[in-house]
């Protein structure tokens, strides 16, 4: 009995001294002076752990003592953030009566903040939200999605509410009452996830209204990651949106059943079905443009979807695999292969191979021109980003595993052939984002992931090219949501690219900010959101096309883009503006400088004269 007591009692000590000291130190109330830089405002601030109910009560008592002391010394109640909760009980009767009279005069129906500032007693006790308490409660629960909920809450709880994300977020459009920047969404998300938790605990399922509101948050994000560069605490809001999308899909609340079924059908046989679907889309767009020509404009104006609201940009019918006959060989070299020849594994993706094969052709031609051998997957591979953006994480993981295995096999074969494979290159920001998740550099440490323009621009510095524009004019460049330059912060990537273009071609490259309004399939699946973004982009394009004050000349050059999806989006904007400007990917524009306007047909002819394991194409 004694031995049992000796082992049982120490484990049940009531309150060790060191634990008491730690708690007292952590819950000690500190009355701090909080000063605003610039305006001279200095006021009291009481830091509180919102998950400690006892500390909250002590803080309220302390605030009451401070307010009482201030009023005894002749101080007044001010309202920097409002007087409605903490300070209302200290507001004098005369001032409250004056406020009541003022509200009755300007707001007789009591619409704005009803019953605010006119009653000292609060109708309910205010609730202070606590991320930590909610995380602990969810962790102790048995909810199936608790890991996702905890991950989301842990990510957004460090938000400082500074609002620096507003400056770069495409979804911040105050003129149209669009305030979906991460600062606002982080605050709303915490409250919604708390409601999701209690809904699951009480009902066993998430309320449909909550799912609808969560979906609204997710739809208002392109997952570009620009906000991460501005965020002082580095909250990956793009990843938060993707995680939320996955959570919604698991609840069958993604909101786009047709899109989901189409992606499920495509992902079962990517190499065969996706090229066929791209051909159908190209052919369908041509037919639709003709049919819409006879539809009355009054009807088209009523349509929200850009598919039915007007003509759309044309897309290529012949894909890269057919243009270069990659079944004859998918490795190209500028000269006879020697051991250690630099080689680039080029991943064209859907945009550079199916919708616009000229982007893929330009990429291969430029890489060959700069002395690199180029390897292209002989069959179509999709990076899977549409699956990730749709919340289909299981299908995305399966597709990524297949791609990783296939690309790793290609890399091993290239190394056996004597190539020095230095880069995995793309010409699309979302492709590069998705490929980075494969982590091929863990198997091949020497492999760097870069944009094709990032590889070729430094090597073209000595070419002495001149841009085909009149002296003194600018080249307009649309900055894509996803950064075009790897290895640098998102906001600096565009400056790096435009700076390299200016240095190479001796022209001024002017950036037109703002989302193009396409965002992959976003323009079709969420037209109410992306129509607003497209309208803002059209305004900025129209301003760029205005006559110059000095010469009176209008801009007549191309619009450069760094993303295949943006090529579609900007072309759609120009169609609606009735402006005729070529929309060129940066690689297309560079290839024109290197080999002329007719370079596409000549390069295809030279390439198709070769076959074999390594096809020698001199550029």
Locations of the language-model features?
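A glycine-rich, aromatic-flanked flexible loop/lid motif
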Residues: 1, 32-42, 162, 216-221, ...
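Iron-sulfur cluster-binding cysteine motifs and their immediate structural context
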Residues: 160, 164-194, 220-247, 434-437, ...
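Non-heme iron-sulfur electron-transfer modules
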Residues: 134-138, 172-212, 234-263, 587
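Extended hydrophobic-aromatic, low-complexity segments
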Residues: 45, 53-57, 168-170, 177-180, ...
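Iron-sulfur cluster-binding electron-transfer modules in prokaryotic oxidoreductases
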Residues: 237-619
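Ferredoxin-like iron-sulfur electron-transfer modules
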Residues: 137-161, 197-223
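Conserved glycine-rich FAD pyrophosphate-binding loop
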Residues: 1-158, 176-178, 184, 246
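Structured core elements
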Residues: 32-34, 43-45, 78, 112-113, ...
């Amino acid at each position: 009995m004694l031995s049992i007591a000796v082992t049982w009692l120490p484990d049940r000590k009531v309150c060790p001294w060191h634990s008491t000291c730690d708690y007292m130190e952590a819950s000690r109330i500190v009355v701090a002076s909080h000063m605003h830089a610039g305006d001279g405002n200095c006021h009291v601030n009481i830091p509180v752990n919102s998950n400690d109910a006892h500390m909250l009560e002590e803080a309220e008592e302390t605030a009451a003592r401070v307010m009482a002391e201030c009023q005894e010394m002749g101080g007044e109640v001010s309202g920097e953030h409002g007087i409605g909760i903490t300070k209302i009980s200290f507001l004098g009767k005369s001032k409250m009566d004056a406020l009541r009279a003022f509200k009755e005069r300007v707001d007789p129906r009591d619409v704005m903040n009803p019953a605010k500032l006119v009653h000292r007693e609060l109708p309910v006790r205010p609730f202070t939200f606590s991320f930590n308490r909610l995380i602990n409660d969810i962790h102790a629960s048995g909810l199936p999605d608790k890991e996702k909920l905890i991950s989301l809450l842990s990510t957004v709880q460090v938000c400082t509410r500074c609002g620096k994300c507003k400056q770069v977020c495409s979804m911040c459009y105050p003129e149209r009452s669009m305030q979906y920047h991460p600062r606002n969404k982080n605050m709303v998300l915490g409250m919604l996830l708390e409601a999701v938790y209690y809904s699951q605990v009480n009902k066993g399922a998430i309320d449909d209204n909550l799912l609808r509101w969560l979906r609204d948050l997710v739809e208002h994000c392109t997952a570009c990651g620009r906000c991460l560069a501005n965020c002082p605490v580095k909250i990956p809001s793009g990843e938060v949106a993707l995680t939320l999308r996955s959570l919604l899909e698991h609840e069958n609340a993604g909101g786009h059943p047709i899109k989901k079924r189409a992606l499920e059908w495509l992902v079962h046989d990517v190499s065969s079905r996706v090229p066929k679907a791209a051909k159908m889309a190209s052919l369908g767009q041509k037919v639709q443009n003709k049919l819409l020509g006879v539809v009355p404009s009054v009807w088209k104006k009523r349509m929200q979807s850009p598919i039915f609201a007007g003509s759309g940009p044309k897309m290529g019918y012949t894909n890269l695999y057919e243009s270069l006959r990659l079944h004859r060989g998918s490795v190209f070299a500028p000269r006879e292969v020697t051991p250690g020849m630099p080689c680039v594994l080029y991943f064209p993706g859907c945009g550079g191979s199916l919708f616009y094969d000229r982007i893929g052709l330009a990429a291969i031609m430029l890489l060959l021109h700069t002395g690199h051998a180029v390897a292209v997957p002989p069959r179509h591979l999709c990076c899977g980003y549409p699956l990730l953006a749709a919340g289909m994480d299981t299908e995305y993981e399966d597709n990524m595993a297949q791609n990783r295995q296939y690309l790793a096999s290609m890399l091993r074969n290239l190394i056996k052939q004597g190539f020095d494979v230095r880069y995995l290159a793309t010409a699309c920001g979302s492709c590069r984002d998705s490929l980075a998740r494969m982590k091929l550099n863990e198997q091949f440490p020497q492999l760097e992931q870069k944009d094709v323009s990032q590889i070729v621009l430094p090597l073209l510095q000595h070419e002495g090219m001149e841009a085909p524009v009149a002296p003194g004019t600018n080249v307009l460049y649309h900055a894509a949501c996803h950064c075009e330059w790897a290895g640098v912060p998102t906001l600096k990537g565009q400056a790096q690219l435009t700076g390299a273009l200016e240095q190479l071609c001796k022209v001024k490259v002017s950036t037109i900010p703002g989302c193009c309004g396409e965002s992959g399939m976003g323009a079709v699946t969420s037209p109410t959101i992306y129509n607003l973004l497209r309208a803002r982009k059209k305004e900025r394009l129209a301003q760029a096309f205005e006559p110059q004050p000095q010469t009176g000349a209008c801009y007549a050059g191309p619009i450069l883009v760094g993303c295949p999806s943006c090529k579609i989006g900007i072309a759609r904007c120009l169609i609606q503006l009735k402006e005729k400007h070529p929309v060129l990917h940066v690689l297309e524009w560079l290839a024109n400088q290197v080999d002329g306007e007719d370079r596409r047909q000549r390069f295809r002819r030279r390439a198709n004269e070769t076959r074999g394991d390594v096809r020698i194409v001199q550029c």
